[in-house]
């Protein structure tokens, strides 16, 4: 499976505290383990938001993913307020 990360995602990830980076990495790995089967575990609280899939990292932090040909592209990681602003772009 093709997995891509935008430059903005990489910058956002780099700006997270270490513990949140660890949780984000674990969430991504967990999501990728289940993505092909589309049998998502409830703990990730995956849902559609516009053209994105939204994943829960913590109750206050989200990841946005876009399905692409042959895989997924991670485009955003951040808190709720930043996520709302990202969706307004």
Label every PLM stretch briefly:
Residues 5, 20-23:
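Hydrophobic/aromatic residues within well-ordered alpha-helical segments
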Residues 28-31, 87:
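Generic helix-packing signal
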Residues 2, 7, 11, 15, ...:
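Enriched for short, Lys/Arg-rich terminal
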Residues 21, 36, 40, 75-77, ...:
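Short linear functional motifs in flexible/disordered or boundary regions
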Residues 30-55:
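A short, surface-exposed loop/turn module that caps and links secondary-structure elements
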Residues 26-27, 69:
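N-terminal G-site helix/loop of the GST-like fold
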